[in-house]
Amino acid sequence: MGNGLNAGRKLLENRKKFRWSDRDYKRRVLQLKRKSDPLEGAPQAKGIAIEKVGIEAKQPNSAIRKCVKVQLIKNGRQITAFAVGDGAINYIDEHDEVTVEGIGGRMGRSKGDIPGVRYKVVAVNGISLKELVKGRKEKTVR
């Protein structure tokens, strides 16, 4: 491949061609993250709590992290969301409407020692889970 005075166009075309080998470039240009994202690019989503699940923490920690399986209203996809706070799982019942958001891990992935959980519960039936756990607010009976 030439590097001469008139080789600019050829160099540019080659760069364009070889950029497709870069995983991050490909994902960004084809918007693959948004297409595969259960929240469809939105910061939060509402869903129905299907069941409570306990997920074992990764080594070297030993705990059962309390999570909830949630079926999203907008597209019917199922995700697992972490219930943040001491005893927070007790405020979430099956068939409750929960609001979920990303858990804040690196590159949109899971955080800490909870394997495969990328979302956290923010609100239950429109009331902040944090407020419920602190006892400032009561859960509404629907």
Swiss-Prot record:
Name the record gives this protein: Small ribosomal subunit protein uS12
Species assigned in the record: Thermoplasma volcanium (strain ATCC 51530 / DSM 4299 / JCM 9571 / NBRC 15438 / GSS1)
Family: Belongs to the universal ribosomal protein uS12 family.
CDD domains: Ribosomal_S23
Keywords, alphabetical: Ribonucleoprotein, Ribosomal protein, RNA-binding, rRNA-binding
Gene name per UniProt: rps12
InterPro entries: NA-bd_OB-fold, Ribosomal_uS12, Ribosomal_uS12_arc, Ribosomal_uS12_euk/arc
SUPFAM superfamilies named among the record's database cross-references: Nucleic acid-binding proteins (SSF50249)
Entry keyword Transport: no
Protein role: With S4 and S5 plays an important role in translational accuracy. Located at the interface of the 30S and 50S subunits.
Pfam families: Ribosom_S12_S23 (PF00164)
HAMAP family: Ribosomal_uS12_A (MF_00403_A)
Cellular-component GO terms for this entry: small ribosomal subunit
Ribonucleoprotein found in the keyword field: yes
Oligomeric and partner information: Part of the 30S ribosomal subunit.
One Gene Ontology biological process: translation
